[in-house]
A protein has these predicted regions:
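Intrinsically disordered, low-complexity segments enriched in proline/serine/threonine
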Residues: 7-9, 45, 88
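Acidic-residue sensor for enzyme active/binding pockets
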Residues: 32, 84-85
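Canonical Radical SAM [4Fe-4S] cluster-binding loop centered on the CxxxCxxC motif
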Residues: 19-61
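Auxiliary Fe-S-binding modules of radical SAM enzymes
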Residues: 1-24
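Radical SAM/AdoMet-radical enzyme domain recognition
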Residues: 61-81, 88-169
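Short amphipathic alpha-helical segments at helix-loop
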Residues: 11, 49-52, 80, 145
């Protein structure tokens, strides 16, 4: 017998999108920097390496935690951590551990280009990250180099995928 779904008693209190659907997912950018220069996202000829921003302009971990806690209070249950490349954010596993400890946040995911994942996959998993999305445009090494602005290698991403699998993702 199939279980009968029960409506969320607080659904009427939730913020809604333009189509009236409750907002339960939050996408949060934790850094405005990337180690690649993909032509569709941040071409080297138009985006400086520092993006015109410095570390002082980023939200602190305390500010991020307070912000996410507020969204959880109004019904957000899923968090996707992004950035240009979120793995460039120093001490990211520490931030994820803080967010994973928030009551009511059921899922934390991260989108990455995967090039820095080999060194961080285990720490991210142990911190409480549930899921990963790795953006991979091609499995051709030369095509990959061209798409990343020659700032990344396919081998780095593949090592990151292996490390993620070994870490339990």
């Amino acid at each position: 017998m199939n279980a009968v779904p029960h409506p969320d008693p607080h659904a009427d209190d939730l913020p809604r999108d333009a189509l009236g659907r409750p907002l339960r997912d939050l996408r949060l950018s934790v850094i405005e920097a990337c180690n690649f220069r993909c032509p569709y996202c941040m071409p080297a000829d138009r985006v400086p390496d520092d993006h015109g921003l410095d570390a002082a302009s980023r939200l602190s971990f305390d500010q991020i935690e307070r912000l996410v806690r507020g969204f959880v209070r109004v019904g957000v249950r899923k968090l996707r951590i992004t950035g240009e490349e979120p793995l460039l954010r120093k001490r990211l596993p520490e931030l994820i551990a803080r967010l994973a400890a928030l009551d009511g946040l059921d899922d934390i995911a991260l989108t990455t280009n995967g090039s820095l994942l080999a060194a961080q996959a285990r720490a991210l998993r142990e911190a409480g990250l549930h899921r990963l999305t790795v953006s991979l445009d091609t499995l051709d090494p030369e095509g990959f180099a061209a798409l990343s602005g020659r700032r990344g290698t396919l081998d780095d991403v593949l090592r990151g995928l292996d490390a993620a699998r070994e870490a339990g993702f």
